[in-house]
Amino acid sequence: NLFLINVTKERNFSYGVWKNRQHIMINIKGGNHIGWGETKVSSNQPDFDMSAWSGQFKKLKGMMLGDAIEEVRNQFLAGNWKPIVTEGLLMTLYDLMGKIENKPTVKIWGLTGEAPVPGIFCILEREETMVVKQAQIAVDQNMHRYVKIKMFGDFELDKKNISALRKFLGPDSFIVGDPNQGYKHVKDLQKLSEIMIALNEAGMDAVEDPSNLSKEDLIYLQANVGKLSIIPDKIMRPASKSINYFDD
């Protein structure tokens, strides 16, 4: 079963605006159990066609659970199915497997770590007043220890919003800036380093994808921004390829 959810909360990015976005909830039944999953499938398409989207994986119906998981993985690794299909499907299938075996998925995978993984509250606003308003929601929901704020590649705007967020949250919150490569207009890495240091001084603890950077660029930047943490994102996807790229 598929359920389309239209989310109408506006989201602002350095590259544009999501007026709305479309998520699909998936459930798959096996025996007396139901597995659930979710994936974001599009943005600014309120009339998204679920039938066309789901047509490619109808072949999974009737398969044994392990075979279905293997098929989804193989289709992804072969480049036939995109992550917007495979992520939700694998989430659903592993949820179903965990319920059938009465085990957490991490145990099925043979993982032994049990350290908590913090959730991160995301703020996607351009206006300072709205940034603070969202920060108040994070505090109200006890999700203010780790906060991500969208940035726009505009130094003065980003600095103003980060400063306001730090002032509101205080010194104990970890603030991650995410410009979605919004500073790619800054071609000189030393200049980019100086901008990142200034944003760190304004209150930003880490930054994700400040520009379109190679592995070597990331290494250089991290070595030249003091205590600020540089977080690669786009270059890490898909993990099936980046694991080899970063293992050199």
Feature locations, PLM:
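N-terminal capping/lid subdomain adjacent to the active-site entrance of alpha/beta enzymes
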Residues: 1-184, 190-200
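Glycine/Thr-rich phosphate-binding loops of Rossmann-like dinucleotide-binding domains
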Residues: 217
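Short acidic, glycine/serine/threonine-rich loops at helix termini
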Residues: 188-189, 220
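Short, charged, surface-exposed secondary-structure boundary motifs
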Residues: 132, 239-244
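Well-formed, non-transmembrane alpha-helical positions, independent of function
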Residues: 137, 198, 220, 244-245
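Short, surface-exposed basic-aromatic patches at helix termini and helix-loop junctions that form
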Residues: 167, 222-226, 246-247
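Catalytic beta/alpha-barrel core
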Residues: 124, 146-155, 176, 180, ...
